Swiss-Prot record:
GO terms for molecular function: DNA-binding transcription factor activity, RNA polymerase II-specific; protein dimerization activity; RNA polymerase II cis-regulatory region sequence-specific DNA binding. It comes from Danio rerio (Zebrafish). GO terms for biological process: cell differentiation; excitatory postsynaptic potential; inhibitory postsynaptic potential; inhibitory synapse assembly; learning; long-term memory; positive regulation of DNA-templated transcription; positive regulation of transcription by RNA polymerase II. It comes from the Eukaryota. PANTHER family: HYPOXIA-INDUCIBLE FACTOR 1 ALPHA, NEURONAL PAS DOMAIN-CONTAINING PROTEIN 4. Efficient DNA binding requires dimerization with another bHLH protein. InterPro entries: bHLH_dom, bHLH_NPAS4, PAS, PAS-like_dom_sf, UPF0758_CS. Residues 61-114 form the bHLH domain. Residues 75-114 are annotated as: Helix-loop-helix motif. CDD domains: bHLH-PAS_NPAS4_PASD10, PAS. The keyword Membrane does not apply. This is Neuronal PAS domain-containing protein 4B. Transcription factor expressed in neurons of the brain that regulates the excitatory-inhibitory balance within neural circuits and is required for contextual memory in the hippocampus. Plays a key role in the structural and functional plasticity of neurons. Residues 61-74 are annotated as: Basic motif.
Length: 844
C-alpha cells in the first residue's frame, strides 16, 4: 500500500513499542476512512479492513462489547432459577405465580429445613418416617392451628400448609419477597417475638405468648388485616456435629392457634377429637364450652374429662364461678362484667386457676367471646403451665398500659392491679399474696385476702344479670364498713400492707354536708386516683414556683363542687374512661371550675410528695389522698415566714433552757444513799387525792397572771435523806400520768415536788401534819411553775391549747386516711374558722 520511499523509519526498541506505533497509524487511517465513507453506504467495510490488523497485533479485545455477554449471563441465571422453581415442593398454581426473588426466598427456606432435619435425623439414628406424606398432610389439617419452624434470628424453615385455613393465604403469599417471620407479623409484636426467641441453655423449654399475624396478601401493607393467635414455642436441640450457624441460631418450633370465634366441635364416635394429656403434648390443649349470660355451663367438649376430670353431665347447669380459684374471682368477675357491658369488648381474655375433679388447681388461659343466641358466651379454655400463665398475664397487663398511653384512653376493663410490686409474680403452690393479685373495686377481694376484722362488702357492686349497680350505703352498709375498719387493733395496722387492701375499704366515710347525687354512676367512677400533687390556696405550688392566690369562699365552694363532680361522669360522654383518669383541676389546668379528663402513665413504684418538715397552723387544702378525699381546713401559708421561724427558734431554745433547769433541780435533790421505806395502800390513795386537788388548784390559777418567783423557805422535811424523793411507787406514777397528763410541762414539776413532799412525810411519820404540809407546799411551789423566761409562758399556753389536737392525732394511722405510697403532713389543728352558715368546716 505504501511505497518504500514514503515508509517512515521508526526505531522500535521492543515488540510492544511496535504495536503502539502501529496502533497510532491505524487510528490515523481509521479517521481518514471514516471521512471518506461518511457519505457511502459501505461503511461496514471499515470494520472488515481494520479487524485483521487488530487480530494480528492482539488489539481486538480493546474493542469488544460487553453488552451481549451480560445478557448471556443473565439468561443463564434465569435458567437456573427456573430449574430451582421446578424443585420446590409446592403446587403448580403457586409456581406459576412466583417471581425470581420469591423463588430464591422459598429455596432458602426449604434448604434450611432439609439441612437441619437431615442432620438431626442422622444424629439420633432415625430412619424412615412414622407417617406417610398424605397422612402427615391430613394430620396437619385436623390441628386447631398451624406449625411454624424458624431460627432465633427469625429465618423461616417451615410453615405448614394449613396456614391458609387460618390466615386466609398460603405460605407463598405470606412469605412474599422475604424468608423472615417478621414480614408476616404485625410490627407491634416484633418486640414480643424477639424476646421469646432469645437463645436459651436448656432445650425443650416451652414459652407461651400472644402474637398478631398479618392476613394481607401484600405483606408490606401491614395493618390491613391481622389475626391474633396464641403461640407456644419450644427450642429444639441442635443437630449432632452441627455447624456454627446452627449453634448460634437455635431452631424453634411454634404451634400457633388463632383466637377466633368458632363453635365448639363436640366429639362423636365417628369423629373423635385427639385429647392427649396436657403435660405430654406440645400442641395447645384446648376445650371449648358455651355459657349463658350468668356464666352457667350449657355445653362443653368431651375432652374436659381428660384435662379436668369432670363428666359433661356433672358440669351441665353448673356455675362457672364455682370452679374458679377464690384468689381469681375478682379478676374473672371484672372481665365478665366488661364483656357484658353495652358497647364494650366483644372478647376478653384472662388467666385463672380452676379446680379439677381431684381437687388440684389447673391454670387456664380463657378467651370469652360474646355472640348472639340463648347461650351467647363462647369460651376457649387453653390448659397451660404456671410459668406460661406468668408470661401471658404479664403480656396482657403490658398491652393494657400501652393502649392507655398510645390512644389516650384505657381499655374498658375494671381490673386495676393492687400494687406495682405484685405484678405477675408466679407462686409455687397454694394461696400467696404475690401470686396474680387482681383487685376489683366492684367485687372486692377474695375471702383468702380479707383484712382481719373487715368483712363488709365494697361500696358499690354490679349485678351482671340485672345490668345495674347496687349501692349498699343506702342500707347503712358504708357506715358499718367504716366502723368495722376503724375497730382494727393498732398492733395489726403496722403489719398490714395497704397495697393489698381494696380501695373501697380504706376510703373515708361519706361527707354529711354534701348533698348526695340522686343516682350513683358506674362503679368504675369510684376507683381511687393516683397519688396527687397538693394544691395550696395560699402557698406555692410544690413542683414549681408559681404562687397561688388565696381564693374566697365562692371560689373554694366552686372548686369543691368541681371535685365532687369529678366522681360523677354523666351518661352523655361519648366513651367511658378509667376512674384514675378523672382528676381534680390542678394549678396548670386550663380551667379552674370544671373537671379535666386525662390519661396518666402507669406508675410502677410509690410516688413520694416532698413536704418540708416544718410546723403548720393547718394542713394544706387540696392535699388529696389516693381516695381523692380533701383535708379538713384550708391552709393560709404552706411555707412559714421568716419572723415566724425566728419566733419558733426562740421558743425552742427557751424550752430547752427550761428543761435543763428542771433537770438540774432533779440532780441537786438526788439522795446519796437511803433505803426505800415501805409503802402503804392508804398512802397511795391519799397521794392520788392530793394530786387531784393540786391539779384542780393549778387549773384554777390563770397562768398569764402568775406572780414572779419569790424565795421559798426550805422545808424541814426536804433535807431528810429518802429514796422515795426520786422514785415513787408504780401506782403513784400511773395515777399521776393518768390524772394530770403527759403534755403539761407544769405537771412534771408538780409531780416532782409532790414526790419530794411525800417522801419526807413517810420518812418522818407525821400524819397529823399532812394537810398543813400540803397547803404550804402548794402555796410555795405554785409561783415556781413558770420560769423566769420572757416567752416561756406563751409557749406553755400554746402547748396546753394544742393538747386535744395531739391526743386526736394519736390514733390517726395511714390505714384510715391514706396509703403508704403517699406521705402526707400530720393532721394538726389550726385556728377555728366559721362560715356564713354557722358551721365550723365544710369539708367534714
Amino acid at each position: 500500500m505504501f511505497s518504500s520511499e514514503s515508509r517512515p523509519t521508526v526505531k522500535l526498541p521492543d515488540k510492544w513499542a511496535k504495536k503502539r506505533c502501529f496502533f497510532q497509524l491505524l487510528s490515523s487511517l481509521s479517521t481518514t476512512l471514516k471521512k471518506l465513507c461518511s457519505s457511502s453506504s459501505h461503511c461496514s467495510g471499515f470494520h472488515l479492513i481494520i479487524r485483521p490488523f487488530q487480530r494480528f497485533f492482539g488489539l481486538e479485545k480493546m474493542y469488544r462489547s460487553t453488552k451481549g455477554a451480560s445478557k448471556a449471563r443473565r439468561d443463564q441465571i434465569n435458567a437456573e432459577i427456573r430449574s430451582l422453581k421446578e424443585l420446590l415442593p409446592i403446587s403448580d398454581a403457586d409456581k406459576a405465580r412466583l417471581s425470581y426473588l420469591h423463588i430464591m426466598s422459598l429455596a432458602c427456606i426449604y434448604t434450611r429445613k432439609s439441612v437441619f432435619f437431615s442432620q438431626a435425623a442422622a444424629g439420633h439414628g432415625m430412619s424412615g418416617s412414622l407417617l406417610s406424606l398424605p397422612e402427615l398432610s391430613d394430620l396437619l389439617h385436623t390441628l386447631p392451628g398451624f406449625l411454624l419452624v424458624l431460627t432465633s434470628e427469625g429465618k423461616l424453615l417451615y410453615l405448614s400448609d394449613n396456614v391458609a385455613e387460618h390466615l386466609g393465604h398460603s405460605m407463598v403469599d405470606l412469605v412474599a419477597q422475604s424468608d423472615s417471620v417478621y414480614d408476616i407479623i404485625d410490627p407491634v409484636d416484633h418486640f414480643i417475638m424477639r424476646g421469646n426467641l432469645v437463645p436459651i441453655t436448656t432445650p425443650d423449654t416451652d414459652r407461651l405468648f400472644r402474637c398478631r399475624f398479618s392476613t394481607s396478601k401484600f405483606v408490606r401493607r401491614q395493618g390491613s388485616g391481622n389475626k391474633q393467635a396464641i403461640v407456644r414455642a419450644r427450642c429444639l436441640p441442635p443437630p449432632y456435629h452441627a455447624s456454627p450457624y446452627w449453634t448460634s441460631n437455635p431452631v424453634w418450633v411454634c404451634f400457633c392457634s388463632p383466637l377466633e370465634a368458632s363453635m365448639p366441635q363436640l366429639s362423636t364416635s365417628r369423629n373423635p377429637l385427639p385429647t392427649p394429656p396436657a403435660e405430654q403434648s406440645f400442641l395447645l390443649s384446648c376445650f371449648q364450652s358455651q355459657h349463658s349470660r350468668d356464666m352457667r355451663i350449657h355445653t362443653v367438649q368431651d375432652s374436659v374429662s381428660v384435662y379436668l376430670g369432670y363428666d359433661i353431665e356433672t358440669l351441665r347447669s353448673r356455675s362457672w364461678y364455682s370452679l374458679i380459684h377464690p384468689r381469681d374471682l375478682s379478676h374473672a368477675s371484672a372481665q365478665h362484667c366488661t364483656l357484658l357491658h353495652n358497647g364494650g369488648e366483644r372478647q376478653v381474655e384472662m388467666v385463672v386457676q380452676v379446680e379439677a375433679a381431684d381437687h388440684s388447681w389447673i391454670w387456664l388461659y380463657i378467651v370469652l367471646q360474646l355472640e348472639t343466641g340463648e347461650y351467647p358466651i363462647n369460651s376457649h379454655n387453653y390448659v397451660i403451665s404456671e410459668s406460661e400463665a406468668w408470661s401471658v398475664r404479664q403480656q396482657l397487663h403490658s398491652e393494657q398500659n400501652q393502649l392507655a398511653l398510645l390512644y389516650q384512653e384505657s381499655r374498658q376493663s375494671s381490673d386495676p392491679l393492687s400494687s406495682p410490686d405484685q405484678v405477675f409474680t408466679p407462686s409455687s403452690s397454694g394461696l400467696s399474696s404475690q401470686s396474680f393479685d387482681f383487685s376489683f373495686i366492684t367485687s372486692g377481694r377474695s375471702s383468702s385476702e380479707e383484712l382481719p376484722g373487715t368483712s363488709a362488702p365494697s361500696s358499690m357492686t354490679f349485678d351482671p344479670l340485672e345490668g345495674e349497680e347496687i349501692d349498699p350505703q343506702s342500707h347503712g352498709g358504708g357506715h358499718q364498713m367504716w366502723r368495722s375498719a376503724m375497730t382494727i387493733a393498732p398492733e395489726h395496722l403496722s403489719n398490714i400492707n395497704l397495697s393489698t387492701v381494696p380501695q373501697s375499704q380504706v376510703a373515708p366515710p361519706p361527707l354529711p354536708p354534701f348533698k348526695a347525687p340522686p343516682k350513683r354512676q358506674r362503679s368504675e367512677e369510684f376507683i381511687c386516683t393516683p397519688p396527687y400533687t397538693p394544691r395550696l390556696s395560699g402557698g406555692s405550688f410544690i413542683f414549681n414556683d408559681e404562687t397561688l392566690r388565696p381564693s374566697d369562699h365562692s371560689k373554694s365552694a366552686k372548686m369543691r363542687q368541681s371535685i365532687t363532680s369529678a366522681t360523677n361522669i354523666g351518661p352523655a360522654q361519648p366513651c367511658r374512661k378509667r376512674l384514675y383518669e378523672t382528676l381534680p383541676p390542678t394549678p396548670d389546668s386550663p380551667g379552674s371550675d370544671e373537671c379535666i379528663l386525662m390519661a396518666l402513665p402507669e406508675i410502677r413504684g410509690p410516688l413520694y410528695v416532698d413536704v418540708p418538715h416544718l410546723p403548720f397552723h393547718a394542713p394544706p387544702e387540696g392535699l388529696l389522698t389516693p381516695e381523692a378525699s380533701p383535708t379538713k381546713k384550708p391552709c393560709l401559708s404552706f411555707f412559714p415566714r421568716e419572723d415566724e421561724t425566728e419566733r419558733e427558734r426562740m421558743e425552742i431554745s427557751l424550752l430547752a433552757q427550761y428543761i435543763s433547769t428542771l433537770a438540774e433541780g432533779f440532780c441537786h435533790n438526788h439522795p446519796q444513799g437511803a433505803s426505800a421505806p415501805p409503802h402503804h395502800a392508804n398512802s397511795s390513795l391519799a397521794h392520788i387525792d392530793v394530786l387531784m386537788f393540786e391539779e384542780k388548784a393549778v387549773d384554777d390559777i390563770p397562768l398569764p397572771n402568775l406572780p414572779s418567783p419569790s424565795p421559798v423557805p426550805p422545808s424541814p422535811y426536804s433535807s431528810v435523806p429518802s429514796y422515795s424523793q426520786c422514785r415513787s411507787s408504780p401506782v403513784q406514777e400511773e395515777a399521776a400520768v393518768t390524772l394530770i397528763g403527759v403534755n403539761h410541762l407544769c405537771s412534771v414539776q408538780l409531780t416532782h415536788c409532790n414526790r419530794m413532799t411525800e417522801g419526807g412525810l413517810q420518812d418522818g411519820e407525821r400524819p397529823d401534819e399532812d394537810m398543813e404540809m400540803m397547803s404550804s407546799q402548794r402555796s410555795s411551789e405554785a409561783p415556781a411553775l413558770t420560769p423566769a423566761l420572757p416567752c416561756a409562758q406563751s409557749l406553755l399556753e400554746e402547748l396546753v391549747t394544742m393538747e386535744p389536737v395531739f391526743g386526736a392525732a394519736v390514733p390517726m394511722t395511714p390505714a384510715d386516711r391514706q396509703q403508704d405510697e403517699l406521705y402526707q403532713l400530720p393532721h394538726q389543728g389550726g385556728p377555728q374558722m366559721f362560715y356564713q352558715d354557722g358551721t365550723g368546716d365544710h369539708m367534714f
